[in-house]
């Protein structure tokens, strides 16, 4: 399944991107993959398409102490994380 989520940022997009790169091995172990991410022009909000086995898996992963700490240190307001919508079908042109 895929979801579209958003989270508020206090340090801009670059630290958030680096955090996701650093956490990629942990995400892969948990079966979670970031498909796409983008920010608003002010870089205080990121929008992310995430692929996972189920929504509970993502919640459990995101609430792990080390993951929440890494997200917070990168400027993500963990409490602001919001699932905008599950994604049914999608199209990504190559």
Regions found by a protein language model. Give the residues of each.
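Short S/T/G/P-rich N-terminal loop/turn motif that feeds into the first structured element of a domain
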Residues: 1-68, 73-94
């Amino acid at each position: 399944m895929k979801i579209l989520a958003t989270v508020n940022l206090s340090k801009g997009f670059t630290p958030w991107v680096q955090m996701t790169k650093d956490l990629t091995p942990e995400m892969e172990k948990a079966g979670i993959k970031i498909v796409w991410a983008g920010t608003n022009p002010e870089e205080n909000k990121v929008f992310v398409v995430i692929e996972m086995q189920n929504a509970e898996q993502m919640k459990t992963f995101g609430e792990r102490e080390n993951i929440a700490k890494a997200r917070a240190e990168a400027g993500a307001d963990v409490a602001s994380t919001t699932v905008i919508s599950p994604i049914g079908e999608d199209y990504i042109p190559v």
